Amino acid sequence: MLMNIVTLISWDFKRNNESFQRAIINGYDYWSRILDDHGVEKYVILLTCNRVELYYRGDPFDVQEKGYNIISDDMAINHLFHVAAGLDSMSIGENEVLKQVKQAYEKSSSMGKSDKFLSLIFQRAISVGKLVRSKTGIGKGKVSIPSIVYDIVRKNGGNKILLVGNGMLASEIAPYFSYPQYKVTVAGRNIDHVRAFAEKYEYEYVLINDIDSLIKNNDVIITATSSKTPIVEERSLMPGKLFIDLGNPPNIERGNNVITLDEIYEISKKNEMLREEKINQAEILIENEMKATMNKIKDLMIDDIFSQFYRFASVVQTMEIQKFRKMHPEVNENDLEALAHSIINKILNVPVTTLKAVSRSQGNSDFNRLFESFSSNFNDIVSAALQSYEGLRDTQSLRDRTRQLLQKS
């Protein structure tokens, strides 16, 4: 794990649906205020129908909304890569989430809330999402009944959905059709059961008294009950409507616009054979991109350290050139500056490239220890040097301070 690169606080439909339903009520401004109140300056907020994710530069902190998950650095980056690739979605490989990741990053960037680390992480995540889809075609085959139903509705249906039933299968399907993308009405025979079920997802609810009227007012009719007799008769199969029957025995009499549970099982079996191979391919791609991204992050961290040293070198360069010019006014100042700049770059290039090369062979935890020890003492030494030169203090104090710090390290 690298030091304070990115922290992620998240709620999502899979890990704790109840707390997620409370968190998703709040919009972008609410979460940005939470981050601002905790002194966070750089962040990206990803809000979708299925997740609330706060990526930010800073230490973990507690938030009022409970049930959240909190991870940091390489774990957070790995999670983002899986999200962008569609591996953490209800519908594996879906394209919409990649668009949402891109929009979240662009919004943060346009507001000045993204720095070079967040930019690197999100740009790489977007690239990973595109790469996984182009190399594996992972979004083309779903396995679970709810995800297959969701795919069918997304491709062929409208946005007004009648869900008949409030049992286990209905509860697995319900989270897929969140507001505002879909308007869902839950129907059943027991008003108390239907109300309790619908209120979990903030859906509308009705008694199933006039099925024809309910069918007329919706685009998609999904039945998932244990009724022993059909709920929808053949005469009620209105043209232009999509019927999905998940009942066993069947809830809907057969018709041309009825998709049955057996048909969905066949889709699932076919896709299951392809899915495992595609997920494995995607994981390999993500692992490779993670290694490349971690190395780039290490480079940025090392560059940050040496940028302070370059600043020190620039101060020394300016002052020494001024001294030299007093003794040799005939020398062209621009040529002298170019020469000095070239010498500094060539000298500092050796430790920079060496440290970057060493970091490639270090695990993240080993690099962390090395970096923390090196950067702490190095920054103290350079800060003392800068103060000495910029303040024109006695260079003897600089030598003494440097010697003490080196002995301490």
From Swiss-Prot:
Active site (catalytic residues): 49
Species this chain originates from: Thermoplasma volcanium (strain ATCC 51530 / DSM 4299 / JCM 9571 / NBRC 15438 / GSS1)
Pathway in which the depicted protein is active: Porphyrin-containing compound metabolism; protoporphyrin-IX biosynthesis; 5-aminolevulinate from L-glutamyl-tRNA(Glu): step 1/2
GO biological process: protoporphyrinogen IX biosynthetic process from glutamate
Domain remark text: Possesses an unusual extended V-shaped dimeric structure with each monomer consisting of three distinct domains arranged along a curved 'spinal' alpha-helix. The N-terminal catalytic domain specifically recognizes the glutamate moiety of the substrate. The second domain is the NADPH-binding domain, and the third C-terminal domain is responsible for dimerization.
Keyword Transcription regulation tagged: no
E.C. no: 1.2.1.70
Top enzyme category: oxidoreductase
Keyword Repressor: no
Role played: Catalyzes the NADPH-dependent reduction of glutamyl-tRNA(Glu) to glutamate 1-semialdehyde (GSA).
Molecular functions per Gene Ontology: glutamyl-tRNA reductase activity; NADP binding
Residues that coordinate or bind NADP(+): 165-170
Key words, A-Z: NADP, Oxidoreductase, Porphyrin biosynthesis
Matching HAMAP family: Glu_tRNA_reductase (MF_00087)
Protein name: Glutamyl-tRNA reductase
Site (Important for activity): 79
Binding partners and assembly: Homodimer.
Pfam families: GlutR_dimer, GlutR_N, Shikimate_DH
Lineage: Archaea, Methanobacteriati, Thermoplasmatota, Thermoplasmata, Thermoplasmatales
Binding site for substrate: 48-51, 89, 94-96, 100
Entry similarity comment: Belongs to the glutamyl-tRNA reductase family.
Catalytic activity: (S)-4-amino-5-oxopentanoate + tRNA(Glu) + NADP(+) = L-glutamyl-tRNA(Glu) + NADPH + H(+)
Note: During catalysis, the active site Cys acts as a nucleophile attacking the alpha-carbonyl group of tRNA-bound glutamate with the formation of a thioester intermediate between enzyme and glutamate, and the concomitant release of tRNA(Glu). The thioester intermediate is finally reduced by direct hydride transfer from NADPH, to form the product GSA.
